[in-house]
């Protein structure tokens, strides 16, 4: 499927000509050509990110082309403090449909999800550095992955299939320098670990769920609720319920501690701890619609893995030092127990503080 509509914007210039005796108004039409997004399902993935025309102008500026809409989960997946920008594009005349609050929107064939990973204040130049862009493209046979690595000049990103590693140093808001070996996923295997349901061979996106995007973000025409924006633009069927049970920003202290914890677990843990997920055999289920039962989050629950000194309990109420869940989120060097096992080498300090407060409150 190719979206090759010749997109042209017609700007109306109103020229008011004033004379001593009369006035008139004249309309002039200026046609400005804009390259259309290209996503031919018989040809993708393309060798270069620029081949899709997702962005206008200099690629590194990430200025979305017409039809490429940003979206953002209210709480995001942690990836060693990488910053992220997300976009969705759909072929002309297609739209997604609502399934339920907690399931991914049913996106049409030809839809593309775009996720850009970058850091600010990268040393030694204290500049922004884009590392990778991941695409999920929906073909008639299902979703495929495409991984693009940005060059040092930040002018292009090239398709790869193997994992890569590069050292990144950046300065945080307290001027502390962090250095990591940033590793990109091996597409044909590691992407599946989070996105696949092995009980039915289903591959699906993760974050673009009504419960996660039911809040406002800034668009070029101002702030707007993301679901409303998708409907307004013609990307989402207007069949949503009046009320959507939604996750919250895990750092929003105006929300209850329990809601914040459940929201963090939902976006960071659910994709593995779900029926058919990589950790389906464990007794934990972190989906937001399931964690009204605290045992689903491991409270007082028997742990699947033995860890000496922890009494084999996932979460021991009031005691972080007897809670295996806390240890697995806290450790940076125990590769057997680090959680999650992919995409994290740094401790997520803000989340650790949240989990400690939660466990101590139980």
Task: Label the model's feature ranges.
Residues 2-11:
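Bacterial N-terminal signal peptides that target proteins for export
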Residues 21-46:
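Bacterial Sec-dependent N-terminal signal peptides
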Residues 25-33, 104, 122-362:
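Sequence context surrounding c-type heme c attachment/ligation sites in exported
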Residues 107-110:
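Short, well-ordered loop/turn sites that connect or cap secondary structure elements
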Residues 85-98:
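Short, structured beta-strand/loop micro-motifs enriched in basic residues and often containing a Trp
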Residues 12-21:
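Bacterial N-terminal signal peptides
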């Amino acid at each position: 499927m190719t979206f090759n509509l010749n997109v042209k914007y017609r700007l109306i210039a109103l020229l008011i000509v004033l004379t001593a005796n009369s006035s008139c108004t004249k309309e002039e039409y200026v046609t400005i050509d804009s390259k259309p997004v290209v996503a031919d399902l018989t040809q993708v993935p393309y060798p270069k990110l620029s081949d899709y025309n997702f962005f206008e102008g200099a690629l590194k500026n990430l200025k979305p082309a017409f039809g490429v809409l940003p979206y953002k989960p209210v709480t995001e997946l942690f990836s060693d403090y990488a910053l992220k920008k997300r976009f969705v594009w759909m072929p002309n005349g297609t739209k997604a449909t609502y399934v339920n609050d907690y399931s991914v929107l049913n996106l049409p064939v030809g839809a593309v999800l775009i996720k850009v990973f970058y850091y600010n204040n990268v040393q030694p130049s204290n500049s922004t550095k884009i590392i990778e862009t991941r695409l999920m493209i929906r073909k008639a046979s299902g979703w495929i992955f495409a991984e693009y690595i940005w060059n040092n000049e930040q002018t292009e990103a090239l398709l790869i299939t193997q994992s890569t590693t590069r050292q990144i140093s950046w300065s945080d808001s307290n001027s502390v320098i962090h250095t990591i070996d940033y590793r990109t996923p091996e597409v044909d295997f590691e992407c599946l670990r989070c996105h696949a349901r092995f009980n039915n061979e289903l591959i699906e996106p993760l974050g673009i769920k009504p419960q996660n995007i039911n809040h406002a973000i800034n668009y070029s025409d101002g702030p707007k609720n993301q679901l409303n924006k998708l409907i307004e633009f013609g990307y989402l069927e207007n069949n949503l319920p009046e009320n959507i049970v939604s996750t919250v920003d895990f750092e929003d202290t105006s929300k209850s501690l329990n809601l914040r914890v459940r929201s963090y677990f939902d976006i960071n843990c659910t994709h593995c701890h779900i029926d058919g997920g990589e950790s389906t055999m464990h007794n934990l289920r972190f989906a937001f619609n399931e964690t009204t039962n605290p045992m689903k989050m491991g409270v007082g629950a028997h742990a699947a893995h033995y860890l000496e000194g922890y009494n084999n309990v996932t979460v021991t109420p009031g005691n972080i030092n007897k809670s295996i869940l806390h240890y697995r989120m806290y450790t940076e060097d125990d590769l057997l127990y680090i959680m999650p096992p992919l995409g994290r080498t740094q401790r997520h300090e803000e989340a650790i503080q949240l989990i400690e407060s939660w466990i101590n409150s139980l």
